[in-house]
Structures are given as C-alpha cells and as structure tokens.
Design a protein with these regions (language model features):
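Short coil/turn motif common to extracellular beta-sandwich-like domains
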Residues: 108-111, 256-259, 421-423, 591-598
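Surface-exposed, short loops/turns at beta-strand junctions within beta-sandwich domains
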Residues: 168-169, 318-321, 483-484, 645-651
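N-terminal secretory signal peptides and thylakoid transit peptides that target proteins
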Residues: 1-16
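Histidine- and aromatic-rich segments of cupredoxin/plastocyanin-like copper-binding domains
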Residues: 142-153, 221-369, 456
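Ser/Thr-rich low-complexity repeats and stalk/linker segments
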Residues: 578-672
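Histidine- and aromatic-enriched segments that form or immediately flank copper-ligand environments
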Residues: 71-198, 205, 271-304, 324-337, ...
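Exposed aromatic-hydrophobic patches
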Residues: 161-164, 311-315, 476-479, 639-646
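Extended terminal and domain-junction accessory segments
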Residues: 10, 18, 22-74, 78, ...
Length: 672
C-alpha cells in the first residue's frame, strides 16, 4: 500500500522530524537548523548568481470569431531534478520541469488560452498522495471554471485549457497548484511561477525589461540525500532553514547604479517575512497585489505574508561601485528562524555602464495611478459581513466553515452571496495569539479600510487580494463583486492551514437553486492530452515555442527531467483499449458511531462513459484485514458520494477507492 499523505506527515516527510511539532501558538523560535544535510552539502549565503526564470512564448496564435487574437500557450507539469544544494540533486515538481516555472508576460487585453498538461507521476514520489492538479492564476478575475477551483482536478495524462482575458490593470500575478488538500506540498515541491500583466500606464513610468526583475522567495528544508524535507508542525506551518530566491539559495545579483524594479512574491507555504536593506535605506513600494498604488510609499521594512506581491523600487545610484547591499529578513513573531533565515539575497553594485534608456531609470515616482478599487467608498457598501479565522478541534476554519462542508453540500454551501456589482465590507477577525493568516479572496481586488481600527500600514495602501491578518488583529476590507457570476474560494494562504481545512466559498449573483453555467467543476472538464480541445478561432501564425531571458543574468536553476512512474495495473473491466479511469477521493471522513462519508470523482477518458463507472470502497486501515465498505456509481458528471450511518464499528483510518474501469487511489480518513 502506498504511503498516504497524513502518514507522510506523521513521519516527517522524508525523515525530518520537527522539533516544534506541537499544535500550540507560536511567538518566535530560534533554532540551529532544520535540514539534515552534511556540512559540505549545506548551501551558504551569497555563493550563487540569481537565476531569472525563462519567459514563455506562445506556441501559436489564433483569431477568435469576434476578430480578437488569442495566444495559445502550453505547459507541462512534470517531475525533474534540480541543482539547489551543493553536490546533490533535489527531486522537484515543476512547470516545464523548472523551479520556479517560466514567467508568462502579457499585455492588457491580450486573450490567452493556457493548456496545462499533467505528466506528473501518478503519486508524489516522496509523500505518496495522488498528483491530480488544479491550476490557479492568482490575481486574475477568471471565470470560475478557469479559476483553479480546489476540486476541479486534472489527472495524470490529462490536460485542461484555461482561458485568461487579461482585462485588468497591470499587476504581478502568479500561477500555482490549488489541488484540494495537497496545495501546500505541491507548491512546496515547485509548482509555482510568476505571471506579469502589463499596460500603458505602468509601462510609461516603471522600469522595464532586464530592470524589471521577478523575485520569488520561498524557504525549504532538506534531507541528507538532498531531497526536500516536509514537516508542517501538526498542520501549523513549515519553516525551512534555507531561503530560496528564484529557486537558488541566498543568491547574488549584479546591478548597475540606477533604479531597479523588483516584483517580490512570497511563495513560502507558511513563512512570513519583514524585508529590509542592510544599509537601512528606504525602498519605494509602487504596487501591491492588484497593481499600482495611488501614491508610492517609502518604507525601510514591510511585513510580507504568503502569496502577497509587492513591486519595490531600489535606487542603487546612491551606492559606490563595489558596494554589496543585502536584502535582509527581520522576520515576524510567528516564524521559526534559523542561523541564516535573516538573509535573503545580495546586490553587488558594478562599474558596468549605466543604461538610462526606458522609463524609471533615474527618478523615483510619487503619484502613480488611481484605481477603481482604491476609489471605492465605505458608504457604497450594501452589507457588512463578519467572520473569524481560527483553529477548532484540530481543523482550521474560516467564518465557522470548512472546505469539507462545501464538498458535502454538493458545492452549494457558501459563506457569502453578494449580488453582481454589490459593494460590501468584510470584517475578518483573528483572535489567536500565535498564528497569522494571509487570507486570499478570489475574483476581487479589495481595499484595506482599517487594521484594529487604525489606518492600513503604508505598504498595503493599494489594491489587494491577500490580507495579512496578524495575531490579535481585525481587518476591514472593502470590495466590489464584479465581472462574473459564480462560485469562488476564500482561504488562508498559509497552505497547511488551507489544506486542513481553512477554505470556504462565496457565490456572486447566484440564487441557491440556480443552474450555474459557470460551475467551477462541471462547466469545463479536463480531456486526455492526446485529444486536444479544438482552438476557438482560426489559425493565424504558429511561431516555435521558445523562451527568452536577459543575457546579463544567470540561467535558471538546472533541472533534469525524471520519467513518470507507471500507473498501477487496472482491475479487469470491459474498457476500450488504451482507455482507463482516473478515480480521486476529495472527501473522506468516518466519525465512529456517527457517520461515514466518502466522495470523489471518476474521470473516465472522454467522460461519456462516466455513468458506467462504479467505485468500490475498501477499509485498508493498517493492522487489520482489508474489508469492503460498499459500492457507488458515478453520475453523468463523474461525481460519486458514498455515505453510511453509523458506519463500521471500528474506526476507519485509511480507505481505498477502486474503479471498475481501472484505477485506484488510497488516502487517509478524517476522524472528526
């Protein structure tokens, strides 16, 4: 039997047992190390050059029926080996096999379709969970069926075509995996990358090209063999002892004596940062998650939670040639810190001739651009909603709701139901003393009205889609629910919190019994990679899919593809040759002497045979013989649910689902 996700957590991933594995609130912890690397393999600060991810080019362009062009992109999610620590290779999951994945750059109004191919192993090579994926373009007002809904899963050898209209103002977005209950481990394994949306306004006032630099910051711990270690401290969070920027430990970047623009993404799955310069000088924040701020903000440090993006200008003209300026991490009280987690990367000022062409080379801007989000007034709100984020019986909740409740309701239960174009105030309270929660609201940009009754901090006075809700803090947010009707998620972006089960949903412009044409799971289904979906328009040009990157910077972290492991043999069934079911479990719960519920999906190739899929459930709890629990048929959409009251008299802790059309999956069972 394969190792289940929760079993992997119990043994600390790949042999790394956390010293702080109690579910108690954190204040601040300092420790020597988390990794088990030999000293010769432990990376040291400032030994590597900053890698810059490749820029992905479209594989073709078509013309939509209305005459607008649409660029078609393709990415493969695949396993690879990365050169991160000295002398050893690290297995990763990556978009096109790189860590982080390629950057996508588009102009406002350019439509794209992104074909996301899942060619990952069937199960995670280290942690044993099934590698079904769901891709979320974080920061995009996408239709629900293209938003990366947690249960909109794409199995191995399948793909999904995501449509992005890119009508919003310029901003730094990122795309990452959002698969239910496994987002943290998949993002930690490498499924994350930046996505830049440009427009004429930012293009005329901010540095561009090689002076517009993505910095994807994350942290990790490593086993002795160089593989990633994973310990989420009883679902509280993971804090590694190695800081990575664009996949490299504590890198160095050579800079000219001019202004640079840095797009800083916190891609850590739990760690927060408080960035500052070693010189103590101020930096200029010009954009937040949702784009340009109304006015630039000068700060010497700022608090940066998971998934937040800040665009920061640093003026290196004030420093002499040969000066090293370090980007430091002053940290926050909710972290576990180690010897070198106070360092992030370094900039070395060179005597290279200064390129002053293009905007923003010499003058720091003050006034930037108004936005509809920041122009909203609290008086426009038609409703105020209040919700708390907290831990309850070892499960993280938001507004008193868990994601399991959403699934159990058939995706109907919602935390809020604003009408289309409604303006509302959401008040989010975190009364805990030791956990912070970076709360992400899909679809919308919002304005932070207040934090504990005071004005928002200087660095967050721009349009946001993630809000840092610190210990003992209450924030008030103002937002307009526009663009699309449908269901969208709200969750904590401390990903172990999200995975255990701090996620809910809201609906926009839907009544309870409405037929939803934009259903996030049912409207657009994945299809086999070999059966590509037809293009929407007519072919115009088909350039080769190449990548570009500035020659002045280092290549991305070296990766080597790893062959996907073979799928398990299908059970005997009358199935057309070459076709096989992909069965997934999305909910598994057995409350002893109360009830038992399992639900999931059947993704039989082509989906037309979904109604012929029958799923058999087995109790495979370790220490006793396997027992058949029951049988359930998938519906026409491939969904299935099995319930029993009160259920078996012995606690089920591990369950296996097996399809008569081939394919099995094993997972742990929630007992509360």
């Amino acid at each position: 039997m394969s190792v289940t996700r929760r079993q992997a957590l119990q043994i600390g991933g790949v042999g790394i047992i956390g010293a702080f594995g109690l579910a108690v609130p954190l204040t601040s912890v300092n420790a020597k190390s988390a990794s088990q690397l030999a000293s010769r393999n432990m990376p040291k600060p400032y030994q590597r050059t900053l890698p810059i991810p490749e820029v992905l080019k479209p594989k073709s362009t078509v013309v939509d029926p209305d005459g607008h062009k649409r660029h078609l992109y393709q990415i493969q999610q695949k396993a690879a080996l990365a050169n991160i620590v000295p002398g050893l290779s690290t297995p990763i999951l990556g978009y096109n096999g790189t860590f982080p994945g390629p950057t996508i750059k588009v102009n406002q109004g350019e439509r794209i379709t992104l074909e996301m191919d899942n060619v990952l192993p069937l199960f995670h090579p280290q942690w044993g969970y099934r590698l079904d994926t769901s891709t979320h373009l974080h920061g995009s007002a996408s239709l629900p069926q293209f938003d990366g809904y947690a249960n909109d899963l794409t199995g191995r050898d399948y793909c999904k075509d995501y449509e992005y209209p890119n009508f919003q103002p310029a901003r730094t977005l990122w795309y990452h995996d959002h698969a239910v209950h496994n987002t943290g481990q998949s993002v930690y394994s490498g499924l994350a990358a930046q996505y830049h949306l440009h427009d004429e306004v930012e293009g005329s006032i901010l540095p561009q090209g090689k002076f517009d630099v993505p910095l994807t910051v994350s942290d990790a711990m490593f086993a002795a063999n160089g593989s990633l270690g994973y310990n989420d401290n009883t679902h509280s969070g993971l804090w590694g002892d190695v800081i990575l920027v664009n996949g490299a430990p504590w890198p160095v970047m050579k800079v000219q004596r001019r202004i640079y623009r840095f797009r800083i993404l916190n891609a850590s799955i739990a760690r927060s940062y408080r960035f500052s310069l070693s010189t103590g000088d101020a930096m200029t924040i010009v954009a937040t998650d949702g784009g340009l701020m109304p006015a630039a903000q000068q700060v010497t440090s700022w608090r940066h939670g998971g998934a937040e993006r800040y665009e920061v200008l640093i003026d290196f003209s004030k420093y002499p040639v040969g000066k090293r300026v370090e980007l430091r991490n002053l940290s926050n009280k909710n972290n576990v810190d180690y010897d070198f987690t106070n360092r992030v990367m370094a900039f070395d000022v060179t005597d290279e001739p200064v390129d002053t062409s293009g905007p923003g080379a010499r003058v720091l801007p003050t006034l930037l651009a108004p936005s509809t989000t920041m122009s909203l007034k609290a008086s426009e709100s038609v409703k105020t909603r209040r919700m708390r984020v907290k831990r309850d019986n070892d499960v993280w909740t938001i507004g008193g709701m868990t994601w399991d409740e959403v699934v159990q309701s058939g995706y109907r239960k919602v935390l809020a139901d604003p009408d289309l174009n409604d303006v509302e105030i959401w008040e989010i309270e975190n009364s805990s003393g030791g956990w912070f929660h970076p709360v992400h609201i899909h679809l919308v940009d919002f304005q932070i009205l207040s934090r504990n009754g005071q004005a928002p901090l200087a660095h967050e006075r721009g349009p946001k889609d993630v809000v840092y809700v610190g210990e003992g803090e209450t924030v008030r947010l103002l937002m307009k629910f526009e663009h699309h009707r449908g269901r969208y998620m709200i969750h904590c972006h401390n990903l172990p919190h999200e995975d255990h089960d701090m996620m809910a949903q809201f609906s926009v412009g839907l009544d309870t019994n409405d037929v939803d044409p934009n259903h996030p799971v049912e409207a657009v289904r994945p299809h086999p990679i070999s059966q590509a979906a037809p293009a929407q328009g007519t072919a115009e040009v088909q350039p080769p899919q190449t990548s570009t990157r500035p020659t002045e910077v280092a290549a991305p972290v070296t990766t080597t593809p790893v062959a996907a492991q073979p799928a398990p043999a299908p059970v005997p069934a009358a199935v057309p040759a070459g076709q096989k079911d992909v069965v997934a479990i999305t909910t598994s719960r057995h409350r002893l002497r109360k009830d038992m519920t399992f639900s999931g999906t059947s993704k039989y190739a082509g989906s037309t045979a979904a109604t012929s899929a029958t799923v058999v459930l087995y109790d495979v709890t370790p220490g006793r013989a396997s027992t058949r629990l029951g049988t359930v048929k998938a519906n026409s959409l491939g969904a299935w649910t099995f319930t029993a009251k009160p259920g078996p008299t012995k606690q089920v802790t591990v369950v296996k689902a097996q399809s008569n059309l081939g394919g099995t999956v094993t997972t742990s069972v929630r007992t509360s």
